[in-house]
Amino acid sequence: GNLWVGNEKMTMKNLNDRLASYLEKVRSLEQSNSKFELQIKQWYESNTPGISRDHSAYLQQIQDLRNQIRDAQLQNARCVLQIDNAKLAAEDFRLKYETERGIRLAV
C-alpha cells in the first residue's frame, strides 16, 4: 500500500512538473507570437505607404449600391405585379370571349 501511495505522489509530481513546463512553453510562445505580430504590423505599415485602414471613403459608394439594389428590387416587384395583372386581364378577356361566343352560338 505505501509503495503505491509513493508512486502516486511521484506520478502526480511528475505530471505537475510536465504541466508547469508546458504552460511555461505556451506563455513563451504567446510572447513570441505577440512580438512577431507586432513586427508584421510594423512591416506592413512601413511597406504600404498611402494605404489607410480608413474605409469611410467607400461608405457613400456602398450606400449608393445598396440604393441601386433596393431600386432594382422595387422595379422587379412592379414588373411581377404588372405580369400578374396582365395574366388576370387576359383570363378575364378569355372568359368574356367564351361567354359572348356561347351566347352567339346559342342564338
Swiss-Prot record:
Q: What is the lineage of its organism?
A: Eukaryota, Metazoa, Chordata, Craniata, Vertebrata
Q: Does the keyword Protein transport apply?
A: no
Keyword tRNA-binding in the entry? The reply is no
Please state every residue range assigned to the domain named IF rod: 8-107
Quaternary organization: Heterotetramer of two type I and two type II keratins. Associates with KRT8.
Q: What organism is this sequence from?
A: Sus scrofa (Pig)
UniProt lists the family membership as follows: Belongs to the intermediate filament family.
Q: What is this protein called?
A: Keratin, type I cytoskeletal 20
Q: Per the UniProt entry, what is one GO biological process?
A: cellular response to starvation
Q: Where is this region: Coil 1A?
A: 8-43
